[in-house]
Amino acid sequence: MLKYPDYLSKLISLLRKLPGIGFKTAEKLAFELLDWDQDQLEAMGQAFSEVSAARSHCSTCFCLKNLPESNCEFCQNNRDTSTLCIVATPKDIFSLERSQIFKGHYYVLGTLLSPITGKHIDVERIGLLKQRIEFLKPQEIILALDATLEGDATALFLKQELAFSSASISRLALGLPIGLSFDYVDSGTLARAFSGRNPY
């Protein structure tokens, strides 16, 4: 029976926890890491340790930020207050920033609603979103969510929750195939989807 050394088995097992990484890919990556020299491995280990110690979220929009600042660079910069873009994860913000089409403010929900798994958005996070809207008083709220069942459910939920605001609500449309996550959309397609957003 095939049996790897314990350290290699543990590494493969940990790599498989990453989304989209199956056994074969994890095995390939693990063997690649075995060829790295000591300095490279130590640098990788240090990077993981720094992520664990320094991981922090903006107190305003919940994007990632550097310590010890309380706000991220997007909330510190002088951005357009007339638009607020709501996304599911911090990664979505960086995807949109690469498209260089949006100059307004962001807000991270933390997750999408899932009618299948029962996953829900934190009540406090929604309350803080409402406070953010009342403070900014944006003219438009953009729902930049995945074109999936979870994205649709979340958009419908937000439309109901944000009915108190006079801001128009729109959602990305053109260029985003049904069922596709932001993770697989290039910046050009995302830019077109942003430009072609529709009232929601």
Swiss-Prot record:
Keyword DNA repair: yes
Signal peptide: none
HAMAP family reported for this sequence: RecR
InterPro entries in alphabetical order: DNA_Rcmb_RecR, Rcmb_RecR, TOPRIM_dom, TOPRIM_RecR
Keywords tagged on the record: DNA damage, DNA recombination, DNA repair, Metal-binding, Zinc, Zinc-finger
Family per similarity comment: Belongs to the RecR family.
Zinc finger (C4-type): 58-75
Protein's recorded name: Recombination protein RecR
A GO molecular-function descriptor: DNA binding
Function: May play a role in DNA repair. It seems to be involved in an RecBC-independent recombinational process of DNA repair. It may act with RecF and RecO.
Domain Toprim, residue spans: 82-177
Source organism superkingdom: Bacteria
The species this protein was found in: Chlamydia caviae (strain ATCC VR-813 / DSM 19441 / 03DC25 / GPIC)
